[in-house]
Amino acid sequence: MAENNTKRGPGHGPGGPRGGFRKPKDLRGTLSKLMGYLGRYKALLVIVVILLFISAACSVAGSYLIKPLINDYILPGDFIGLAKMLCVMAGVYVVGAVCSYGYARIMVHVAQNTVAKLRADLFNKMQKLPLKFFDTHTHGELMSRYTNDIETVSEALNNSFASLISCSLTFVGTVMMMIVLSPILTAITAVMLGVMLLVVKTIGGRSRRYFAAQQKAIGAVNGYIEEMIEGQKVIKVFNHEAAAKAGFTGLNDTYRDAATRAQAYAGAMMPAMGNLSHINYAITCCVGGLLAIRTGDLGGLSAFLQYTKQVSQPITQISQQVNTILSAVAGAERVFEIMEAEPEVDDGKVTLERVKENPDGTLTEANYDTGAWAWKKPDGSLVPLRGDVRFDHVVFGYDDRKIILHDISLFAKPGQKIAFVGSTGAGKTTITSLINRFYEIQSGTITYDGIDVRDIQKDSLRRSLGVVLQDTHLFTGTVADNIRYGRLDATDEEVEAAARLAGADGFIRHLPDGYQTVLTSEGGSLSQGERQLLNIARAACANPPVLILDEATSSIDTRTEKLIEKGMDRLMAGRTVFVIAHRLSTVRNSKAIMVLEQGSIIERGDHEDLLAQHGRYYQLYTGQAELA
């Protein structure tokens, strides 16, 4: 809408790091919702848990087999038995490796399908949200839900959940076997593990703080870069390159400092844990060696030392995986916030349908474009569509504290062209958005052929309205596909006819592949005027009974505007047309011109009547005032 600026804000771009740690607000509730998505894979998840148990058991058992390997075969010199035992150990490790591969593959399948469903549900939910929702959420914020947050969930499902269970099982199994081998050495190791846990908590806590600062800083950098890229022309016109560089340097330095501190603490974790592990190993060797001399259990000492190496690894990994999972749950929570947002309300029962007239004069529904429409009431009766649109004392505001439109009343008949003139923010686009029911009014009524638009299903209502917005938007695809977006079942001939009607056929045929020329997003290879012509052709393809032109020629030069005037007149013939004017020359032939100021209609009449009033319209037309 013209009155609303596009929501873009720094700090929400998709390029932000995922290293920052975020705790979920409702851990249990969000996990429950995630489990709802994973519930379809219960059988596979049971298999994963079984494979995890087997894999962890093999890892623990493999180390324990070192004891009989040394005591029963190496020391006695039983090399045949040694060979057999080596084969047993190899078999144990092979089984563990196969199980690890198996659960990893299954989790990839489960994770990717779950994330695909989550992403699809999020996208589908977006299509059901009212425009008011997008007015209060930045583009970058919404994109981060699709990218950062869902990717964090994917990463956790792919690796972290299974790894957390595996590490926990391995840790418990290892500690149990250490107690079996030597309670004394286990007590020594437990003391060192306590020190390790303290180090993990201290370093991890500070690391998370600085990673959060890093994430905030990179968000600010991304937002600034996005803003500067979009505003390059303005920056160069006003010669503000130096100021732009200075602003970026400050943000970049802040990010550098935050990232340096975050990475310094994160990088200290592994060396600290490694050194503590080495100290623990050395102490265990000394004490264990003395015990082995007394008991002669060299194999038990060797097995215990192997467990000593293993036991510290799960501690670090469990801490890392827990943080990753909590971040993923926080990301999922943000996704579910959108999914639980209030959808667009549609209580309409009346529908608009394409119809054909039978020889006896009755109407029947048609599944192709007949150029005729009718209301289909709840009782199934069909009433021809006329195209009368009436506003009766309409009051509207985006919220109750800020009213945008005050007591708007107007009436438009088929074949009439109603124009809206006024300064930016006067409420011109808002009026046409209310016809579409993009927003709900506070009071008053808007009727379409005498039927309250709130009683009409929104999809049917919008299908009957052709809209050419002031902001052109083209999709990646062919020229024909972009025109056909107005009516997906349009034939190639109908697409070309719509282009000729809009005056776009000429330049389209000069494109490399004509109507099959592939356009990039937003039609970057076309001029602004050419993009707008395709927008107008799209509306012509829809062949609607009511047409809304939201400053449709504001981006077209005067020469191009002259080329399409006749086509636009043909497009508007017989239709109810609402025009939001950027150039007053485009509304001279309007049946009625509404002059708006601060949300109220202050003047109305045709061109000659308004000039005779010597009011606001007269000032605008004669150049005594400007459309600012």
Give the positions of each predicted feature.
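Membrane-integrated ABC transporters
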Residues: 1-59, 74-88, 103-107, 111, ...
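Juxtamembrane helix-loop junctions of ABC transporter transmembrane domains
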Residues: 19-27, 50-51, 58-71, 79, ...
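Alpha-helical membrane-protein architecture signal
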Residues: 27, 31, 35, 46-47, ...
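Transmembrane helices of ABC transporter permease
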Residues: 40, 44-54, 88-98, 159-213, ...
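Helix-loop-helix
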Residues: 78-80, 84, 177-191, 261-333, ...
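Helix-loop junctions and hydrophobic alpha-helical segments within the transmembrane domains
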Residues: 122, 126, 235, 335, ...
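An intracellular "coupling" helix at the cytosolic face of ABC transporter transmembrane type-1 domains
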Residues: 131-132, 148-157, 161, 165, ...
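ABC-type nucleotide-binding domain
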Residues: 355-628
